[in-house]
Each structure stands twice: as C-alpha cells, then as structure tokens.
Amino acid sequence: MVVKMDEYKNEIDSMLEYTYQWLPENYSDPTEPILKITKSSLGTFDWCPKKYDFSYQQRLPQDQTEAMRKGTIMHNAREDFFNDFDIKKAETMSEEEILDYCSSLFPIDDYCEDYQTIAVFESQRFIDALAENKTHEYLPVCNEGLFDCEITIPMGPYKGGAWNNNEEFSLSRDYVVHLQGIIDRVFQEGNGYIPMEFKTGAWKDYKATGMRKEMAFYKILIDNASDLVLRNAGLEPNIPVSHWSWYYPISNHIHCETSKKRNETSVMNNIARLIHSYEQKLFETKFYYKTCAHCSYFGICDAAQEDTWV
C-alpha cells in the first residue's frame, strides 16, 4: 500500500510538539511540548546523565571524531548498496560475479577494505538465498526508515538501580512522550520482521547488553507506530517483530536472536529514569577515567576535573 505524502505529513503534524528542553512542570499545558526521546538520547542518558544534560538539554557542541565521520560515510554506503542492488541481474551471475557485483556497489574511499568485508558477507548471503529460493527476502523491506510514535509512561513505582542506591521511585504522574528513530534496516523472514543495526566499530562481548537495549527501543517504536507511519517506512501493520539483529563488519560479527520482552521492560524503565531526572532537575555524572577521557565535555565536567586532581 502506497502512502500519500500529504497523509503522512498530516499524521506527523497531528502529534504533540516535542523537545529535549522539556519542563515537566508545564506538562498540563496543552500548548507546551512533550519530551522527545531517541535511541541515541536514551543511550547517552544511560551512559552518563550529565553528558545527556550537556548534549541534549544545553545543546553544547561536540567535536566530530574520526569514528563519527566513518560511521556517517559507511552508513550512507550501505544504504546505497541496498537501493542499487538488482535482484534480477544478480540471479544470472556466477558466485564469483556476484562477489564482484557486490563490491562494485560500494564507493572508492578510505574504507574500501571494510566495504570488501561487507561485500563478501552480502554476496554469500545472496548465494544462500538463491540456493533456498528466498531471494525475495534478500533486500530489506525498510532501508533507513524514519519512525515516530507517542507512548504513555506510567507513574510507577519503578525499581531503582545502582544509580540511586537501589531505591524505588515513582513519577509525579503518567506522561506521554514522543519516540523517534531511524532504523538502519528491517528484513522480513517468514511472517516476522527483523530490525538490523549496522555498526562500524569493533565488536566486544560486553556490548551485547547495550545492543539489546537499542533493538528493544526499535521494537517499541515499531509496535507503537501508527499504520501510516509503518507503511511510509515500508512495513505492514499486521506483521510483528519476531527477532532483532546487529552487524559489526569490522569484527566480522553478526548476531540474530528472538526479541525479548525483558529488554523492552528495561528500556521502559530507563525512560522512566530519564523523566525522573527531569522532574528532579538532577543529571548526575558517571565518572570512569578510561571512558570519560575521550568525552567531548571532559574539560567542563566537574566530576572529571575533581577526579583528575585527586
């Protein structure tokens, strides 16, 4: 079903305004914006509430690192790969030609070696799809799709964590918040969707917990998006998210697993924690010298400066 752009625009415009510079004390005023939450903003808060405050509330600039530059360029290249891949053309090729074809769809730049790793992976995936007569599932049904939705976060109570001495907390009321995100890819296998996240850094086993939170955020986003938003991104409302996946080509690591409700619960709890920080107007630091030393806000963070001089 093709969505008319004016219908999609009207759907988005009908949602409440949203912002990171949110004031919970004004929530009852219908003219005031609600809280905007993305996978990145929630991940930053989980990593360090103070960094979230610097980046999203105060909107202080960050230095662009080589990792950021690489991520942007390689994400664009992978998006273009799927836009340009011709199933009918590839079906007539030999295995060697399929690899050459996949390689040819990537640009020539500083990351050619990384692209070749991806080309090998994608060529083998297509060869396997050919053998199983599943080339119709090779391309993603959604390639860099934008999703928006509104969800209600109950007042609680919520279990606390190490961040607040494991004390339970409650919000002052239920809140509607706006979730937004761009999902790299969504594939369909059988009767289920599989969101897949593309990462350009190196895989470490400790990252699995964070990846599950990221993918659970996307599942919540898809599950709560309207039919128009889903169809605009290429998805059908009656097909559920059955699995999620992530791909780290630099480490030749790919993982796919059944989606887990407990990870969604963890994300919802983190959103409640974020709202609680806004209510308390308190965004505490999580100082750890090995990671904080690379933070763009190291020079203005009181916790970092105090620890440095100890």
Features from the language model and the residues they span:
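A non-catalytic, helix-rich entry segment at domain boundaries
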Residues: 73-167
